[in-house]
């Protein structure tokens, strides 16, 4: 007699039959939703490969199937990869609405968005970009020789669809890299231009100028072999200034004089999403711990407040994120006096913006002029050696406490998940995303200072 089939295999077979009721019955009897065939396909992956199995895919997701189940091998990946490859727009939207990660790379180093572009499914490309973009909209792109812009700028511009999206990465703990994508029309799946923003500089229009355009310069260097030869020649002879090949893109708002759209575009290039339409993947962590009970929240808040009162230095520390210097020059403007805008961002990823009350004396007119005209000077780092106590001499009670800088501590409420969310507007990094959202929904206030929480933002550390 042949080997008896498992309930998971029977459930897998019911997917190909389109039998949703049979799937529910087998799941109640213990059928495994993550059973894999010889090719590594789960029931959900199989359902996402056929447009006629949309209801089956919806049933599997409702029963708890893993929307990010990974199938190794060429032309494989997550359920979202398979749906994007076949142009199943409704299935793609279903997966995205239930937490599918659109930035996962398959074994071919492609995200679902890149798979849809290669296959030419513009509807799927628009659906994924709408879900993850920091900016999207019609703009005017200037082309042709630069000197002709002075004489006939309108004749040398064309209307293009511009999107700023994060790229995929093998390491989800690193900040996301951003790229600028330009399409000739909404019907195009393949972009006309793709520029990596972590290798580019943004030249914003100055406030006193009437020119409402922005230029992005790609400072990608010459290939490594030629650069190596140049360095060898420079070391043996007289040094010459190296000329770097540049790619320039110049944009203006689709409606002349629309400074608000231009500001949103410039902010998105720096990693700041639009305030009214932030990307969905920035609003919640991909895998959040279960919400704690009300008693646990209350105990955690009391313990956090007690710790803060005993250590007043924590009250004045607003940890927003670590910033790193860019490899090339960047243009920055000082925030208006009266409010300090803190922005944790480096040239390789997405930062978080939050406004807080000023913690330093206001800038004078001379200081503001210096900031506008010259580079920003950051405080120097004290490299004086510090005597630290050994691990054996530390008291045992400090093992589970949060570090003073708040960067690597755990949640002060559930004491389980990492402290990865910030309260707005007070700026305290007080806990994990799940706990702080629960506190905000109950209007309990910040666990550190009891201030009202207007928004909870997830931090992406460098």
From Swiss-Prot:
Q: Cite the record's Polar residues compositional bias ranges.
A: 304-317
Question: Quick one: a GO biological-process term for this protein?
Answer: protein ubiquitination
GO cellular component entries: cytoplasm; nucleus
SUPFAM superfamilies, per the entry: Ankyrin repeat, RING/U-box
This molecule's function is given as: No E3 ubiquitin-protein ligase activity observed when associated with the E2 enzyme UBC8 in vitro.
Q: Where are the ANK repeats?
A: 6-35, 39-69, 75-104
The protein's name in its UniProt record: Putative E3 ubiquitin-protein ligase XBAT35
List, as start-end ranges, the regions of compositional bias called Low complexity. 319-341
Q: Where would I find the RING-type zinc fingers in this protein?
A: 411-450
Q: Where is this region: Disordered?
A: 277-341, 356-402
InterPro entries listed in its UniProt record: Ankyrin_rpt, Ankyrin_rpt-contain_sf, Dendritic_Spine_Reg/Scaffold, Znf_RING, Znf_RING/FYVE/PHD
| Record's catalysed reaction(s) | S-ubiquitinyl-[E2 ubiquitin-conjugating enzyme]-L-cysteine + [acceptor protein]-L-lysine = [E2 ubiquitin-conjugating enzyme]-L-cysteine + N(6)-ubiquitinyl-[acceptor protein]-L-lysine
* Record Pfam families: Ank, Ank_2, zf-C3HC4_3
Name the Enzyme Commission number(s) assigned to this protein.
2.3.2.27
List the pathway annotation.
Protein modification; protein ubiquitination
Q: Name one GO molecular function term.
A: zinc ion binding
Stretches that traverse the bilayer:
none
Alphabetized UniProt keyword annotations: ANK repeat, Metal-binding, Repeat, Transferase, Ubl conjugation pathway, Zinc, Zinc-finger
SMART domains in the cross-refs: ANK, RING
What is the protein's species of origin?
A: Arabidopsis thaliana
